[in-house]
Amino acid sequence: MILDNLFKNLIYDPVSALGILVFYILLVNLPISLGAVFKKKSFFIVKLLTILVNLLITLQLLFRWSISGHFPVSNLYESLYFLAWGISMGQLYIEREYSSPIIPSIAIPIELLTVAFACFVLPDDLKLSSNLVPALRSSWLVMHVSVVMLSYAALIIGSLLSASVLFINRNKPLQIRSSSTGIGGFKFFNNNYLNDLADPVEFSHSEELDTLSYRSILIGFVLLTLGLISGAVWANEAWGTWWSWDPKETWAFITWLFYAAYLHMRISKGWQGRRPALLATSGFLVVIVCYLGVNFLGIGLHSYGWIFG
């Protein structure tokens, strides 16, 4: 019955139908991904389903783009699916570098929650595409919003990877060798390994995850920086001001400062182990408030719509 309705809706409303189909695939993939942590044979199935999810979201966004005539990040519904697309793409990319079932086990639940929020929590009127106001009919829409959303995806993945490091080492001391570059990281590496340069160094599972977390956050920070700069340029063109302290702008700046502090502590101060992992993990809440918190306020130029309105 569900499949029949989905296939019928694919003809009349392909965007919504594909969105719901993505939800059901993620719902199936969730227990498989969690089980793959203990039974690695199912890891391949998890990866195939993630690829399918990413392709279906790509198709959904292309349909919305074709129907609306503008890049599909103009409302909360579209941006949620774009975020899910970014997280799934990041998950697949990281799995190419380091094949671990831990990665999908933390990424897929967030993808599922994101899609479920878009499908079943948002009011129907916020799911509809609408004409853009003149200020948003700009090529900056693609540059600014897409880069910021991808930065959120990278920062979320990095924060969750740090959370996984803390969980794996919850009942034992967390010793992480340096995975950062810079003065502090060099000093730490130099003090511990200068006498062992002739020997190959094998990093533990936690150290690999910590390295992936650091790199993901670094990429997210760079993207967020580009997003803030492009947003300022766009705002100046559209409204004649570079910065207006809009709630979203303010929280984006707070998010930027938060992760700048994290990177400073790792690169310059040589922080390793539990402290940076705790800081990165708490960054997840900062990103969520930045992305969704403004929508609960229902104010500001960046509000996608008050979900209770």
Swiss-Prot record:
Keywords recorded for this protein, A-Z: Cytochrome c-type biogenesis, Membrane, Thylakoid, Transmembrane, Transmembrane helix
One GO MF term attached to the UniProt entry: heme binding
Subcellular location: Cellular thylakoid membrane
Gene Ontology CC: plasma membrane-derived thylakoid membrane
Annotated Pfam families: Cytochrom_C_asm
InterPro entries xref list: Cyt_c_assembly (IPR002541), Cyt_c_biogenesis_CcsA (IPR017562), Cyt_c_biogenesis_CcsA/CcmC (IPR045062)
Superkingdom of origin organism: Bacteria
Ranges annotated as spanning the membrane: 18-38, 43-63, 67-87, 102-122, 148-168, 216-236, 250-267, 279-299
One annotated GO biological process: cytochrome complex assembly
Lipid bilayer topology: Multi-pass membrane protein
Quaternary assembly: May interact with ccs1.
Family: Belongs to the CcmF/CycK/Ccl1/NrfE/CcsA family.
Task of the protein: Required during biogenesis of c-type cytochromes (cytochrome c6 and cytochrome f) at the step of heme attachment.
NCBIfam families: cytochr_II_ccsB
Name by which UniProt lists this protein: Cytochrome c biogenesis protein CcsA
Organism the protein comes from: Prochlorococcus marinus (strain MIT 9312)
Lineage, broadest ranks: Bacteria, Bacillati, Cyanobacteriota, Cyanophyceae, Synechococcales
Gene: ccsA
